Amino acid sequence: LYQAYHDQEWGTPQRDPALLFEMLLLEGFQAGLSWITVLRKRERYREVLHGFDPLKLSQMSDERIEALMLDAGIIRNRLKLKAARRNAQAWLAVDNPAEWLWSFVGGKPKVNHFVGRSDVPAVTDEAKAMSKALQKAGFTFVGPTICYAFMQATGMVMDHTTDCDRYAALAR
């Protein structure tokens, strides 16, 4: 599962607003946990969170959140579930959220040339700026580390290391 995600999705530039929203929420759900935990629960999240439809999520009731707290198929964290609802509301209030998010890297992927994984930073100035702007717009669970992981996952920054099979394909 993790290898497939790495080989087929991570670091590939993504401009689809629906997938960007999904990834932003998943990165928030991951806070304090391993990414593989989130990947294993991703399909269940899609089922119970209306396919990550921001309009439907923005209207999720407190009762629905409480019901989701009983679902072992997801990460049962009330704050993260409420953040998903709040982030959906904030997402809907942003004019062209995909373009806005991509603006933090100048609208095109920032290709890095890291040799080893230890060279890859956890946070960058762009991620700090994105985090600050998202928080100002009403988003939660969007600290700089989460934002940088989001930028990596969606290909806003290309952090496959130079010895990775995906590097050559994505560095073009």
Regions found by a protein language model. Give the residues of each.
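HhH-family (HhH-GPD) DNA N-glycosylase catalytic core used in base-excision repair
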Residues: 1-172
